[in-house]
């Protein structure tokens, strides 16, 4: 005690921009081809749980002008991190990458060998870091957990920024994996001998938000991992409670 000065870090500012004409806010009635917007609420909660301040940029329409306007608002707000959700793939309405390039992004990568979350991107617009997340709810959250959270921790000055891998055993058989790292949503149980058991949820579709909500962890499967039977050792990452 009795230190005249202490090193401190400012809380990072995270701006969150959703994209897509198909999105409507909760409480609205979805029209044909529309869905209720959920990603932003999960991302705001996740960022705040790590000590960040968040800025809600709303939903950009599927036009370059609307998407670019949202990106510029993020820069004007002084955000340290811009997180976009949706529009990160290569369809006619996936305009985030083009809007970011038009604004001058230095792209670090686009597309990663993991499931869920292949069409993720990352780069920098000046001092602002940019993370472009997929639009599917599970993909968006898993990528934010794996990439946004460590970035927030690093900008907060923490020495421990990565998620801790825990040892467990499989609670049921899992099939062989392909060339992508797989992050299976799983429930956790504890055996009488104290061993942690990871039980993958039955359906791993990246649109099934309820199955993510029921999971306590991500079961990590390496690329080309062979088929594994129940009782095989494995590694998990605990999700926020």
Enumerate the predicted regions with their spans.
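Glycine-rich beta-strand-to-loop/alpha-helix junction loops that act as flexible
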Residues: 19-20, 82-96, 134
């Amino acid at each position: 005690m009795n230190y005249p000065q202490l090193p401190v870090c400012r809380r990072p500012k995270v701006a969150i921009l959703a994209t897509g004409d198909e999105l409507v806010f909760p409480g609205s009635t979805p029209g044909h081809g529309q869905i209720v917007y959920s990603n932003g609420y999960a991302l705001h909660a996740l960022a705040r749980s790590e000590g960040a301040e968040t800025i809600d940029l709303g939903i950009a329409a599927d036009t370059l002008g609307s998407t670019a306007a949202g990106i510029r608002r993020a820069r004007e707000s002084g955000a340290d991190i811009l997180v976009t959700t949706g529009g990160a793939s290569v369809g006619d309405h996936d305009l985030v990458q083009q809007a970011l390039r038009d604004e001058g992004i230095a792209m670090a990568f686009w597309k990663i060998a993991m499931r869920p979350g292949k069409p993720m991107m990352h780069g920098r617009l000046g001092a602002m870091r940019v993370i472009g997340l997929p639009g599917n709810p599970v993909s968006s959250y898993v990528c934010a957990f794996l990439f946004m959270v460590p970035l927030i921790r690093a900008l907060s000055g923490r020495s421990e920024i990565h998620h801790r891998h825990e040892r467990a055993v499989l609670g049921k058989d899992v099939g062989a994996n392909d060339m992508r790292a797989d992050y299976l949503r799983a429930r956790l149980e504890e055996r009488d001998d104290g061993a942690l058991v990871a039980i993958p949820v039955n359906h791993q579709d990246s649109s099934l938000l309820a199955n993510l909500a029921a999971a306590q962890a991500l079961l990590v499967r390496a690329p080309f991992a062979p088929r594994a039977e129940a009782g095989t050792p494995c590694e998990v990452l605990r999700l926020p409670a």
